Amino acid sequence: MKLRVSAVQYHLHTINSFKEFENQVTHYVKTAAEFKSDFILFPEFITTQLMSIDSDNIFSSINQLPQFTEQYYNLFSSLAKETNTHIIGGTHVIEENGKLYNVAHMFYPDGRIGKQPKLHITPTEVDEWNITPGEGLQVFPLSKGTVAVLTCYDIEFPEIVRMAKAMGADVIFCPSCTDDSHGFHRVRYSCHARTIENQVYVVTTGTVGALPTVDFMRANYGQAAVITPNDVPFPQRGIMIEGDINNDMIVTADLDLDLLYEVREKGSVTTWRDRRVDLYPDFEELVKIKNELIG
């Protein structure tokens, strides 16, 4: 079974209206649809571009972003339906019970919307934007495999990816937003490590461009990539495809899930199967116990 995925290196720049944001998003989605992609991944914090709309800084506070939630939902839902694709609309800041959450959204062709809040929050998100960490990990079972969405900093924590794999995820989508080479490579190297540890695919992308009037979004350093385990059937460096750093573009690749399953059973190394669960937690067993308690 194969999945075709596209990842958008989203160009942030000052805009004057939500319509401009809509036009830019639509351009990327329709471009990916021309490649007949099953999934389209946008980066973290793409809706911070909406904070640049008003020259008088009416929208410059992160607290104003939730007011765009309905428009954001309508836009991505309509595009998912129109193109019959699953769209991970990057992340958008929403408000629940007076708290702000940085939430990744999965837009289904049938109109459903899945949500995965960011679970690990960076110091800047806490200190400058008062973002609250989400609670709970979920995976998204689909007709073509099971996926999870772990945002940027989340991918730097091996345990949460172990949990996602134990819950059945074969593909981890990682929308990110980093402002320099240090941050970018932390995320990128973590993505590679997670593919090796769990024998999964990771699809990642980041923001490029700049928002000169939006604090903490003035600099962006991003690159999309489709990352594989390091074994004989895959590319030697574990990179199926990657974009040009800091360019406005889309990358597209096919993920062969059958090949992934084969490597887990008969690969040069079988890292998932060879875990020493007598020495450290067995996440498959923990997930099973959790499901029994819930059920």
Residue ranges and their predicted role:
Residues 68, 72-86, 156-248:
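CN hydrolase (nitrilase-like) catalytic-core segments centered on the catalytic cysteine
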Residues 208-295:
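C-terminal beta-strand edge segments of enzyme domains
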Residues 18-109, 178-193, 197:
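Cys-nucleophile CN-hydrolase/nitrilase-fold catalytic domain and related Cys-dependent amidase chemistry
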Residues 8, 116, 140, 243, ...:
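Hydrophobic residues at beta-strand termini and immediately following loops
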Residues 9-15:
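Short polar catalytic/cofactor-binding loops
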Residues 1-7:
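Extreme N-terminal starter segment of soluble prokaryotic enzymes
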Residues 94-171, 175, 180-193, 269:
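Active-site catalytic loop in hydrolytic enzyme cores
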Residues 89-91, 103-106, 138-139, 204, ...:
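Short beta-strand scaffold segments in enzyme catalytic cores
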